[in-house]
């Protein structure tokens, strides 16, 4: 996975769900400050023994394009540790205003997280997502329904496909 995100080489993940759809030349672009008119959000697949995976996405509505602008992939994180890392990354995102001035993000970001992170652990402790929300790391549960995983995988394949302009709708910046 690291080779995929760092170098854009998803061929290293043999048999991966999106390996056939991934093309480094088409899907990787240089990083850039995000226009402050774009929406930035994050998505998390929470884990402890298995890694937590957080992706920051910038949405360019004018061109109907999504940019994955940052990623965190780490196991063994307690809720407060994950919240601290996520909030630090939120603030490190570079944004630009309409006048070309670049600064660090000051907008409070929100995201979706696997609804299991809101489940009662049976230990008397609050659910992991609730612990993070309490620390200012805002999460809403990702809605699940029968077939939702397959549906979302299909949507990602559509975003990775080239559009009318010859470019995919999902890129890694």
Predicted regions and their residues:
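Short, well-ordered loop/turn elements at secondary-structure boundaries
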Residues: 35-38, 48-51, 104-107, 166
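A conserved active-site cap/scaffold subdomain adjacent to cofactor or substrate pockets
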Residues: 37-56, 66-73
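Mg2+-dependent endonuclease catalytic cores in nucleic-acid-processing enzymes, primarily RNase H-like
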Residues: 55, 62-173
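A residue-level signal for conserved active-site and pocket-lining positions in enzyme catalytic cores
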Residues: 2, 6, 54, 111
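Hydrophobic/aromatic-lined pockets within catalytic cores
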Residues: 7-11, 48, 59-62, 161
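Short catalytic/ligand-binding loop motif for oxyanion handling, primarily in non-cytosolic enzymes
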Residues: 14, 50, 120-121
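ATPase catalytic-site recognition across NTP-hydrolyzing enzymes
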Residues: 1-46
């Amino acid at each position: 996975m690291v080779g995929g995100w760092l170098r854009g080489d998803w061929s290293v993940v043999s048999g991966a769900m999106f390996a056939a759809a991934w093309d480094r030349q088409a899907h990787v672009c240089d990083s850039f400050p995000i226009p402050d008119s774009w929406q930035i959000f994050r998505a998390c697949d929470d884990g402890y023994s298995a890694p937590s995976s957080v992706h920051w996405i910038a949405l360019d509505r004018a061109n109907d394009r999504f940019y994955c602008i940052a990623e965190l992939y780490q196991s063994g994180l307690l809720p407060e540790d994950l919240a601290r890392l996520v909030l630090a990354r939120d603030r490190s995102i570079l944004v630009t205003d309409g006048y070309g001035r670049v600064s660090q993000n000051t907008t409070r970001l929100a995201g979706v997280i696997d609804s299991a992170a809101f489940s009662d652990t049976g230990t008397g402790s609050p659910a992991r997502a609730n612990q993070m929300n309490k620390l200012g790391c805002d999460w809403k549960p990702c809605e699940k329904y029968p077939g939702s995983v397959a549906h979302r995988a299909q949507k990602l394949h559509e975003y990775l496909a080239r559009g009318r302009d010859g470019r995919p709708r999902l890129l890694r910046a």
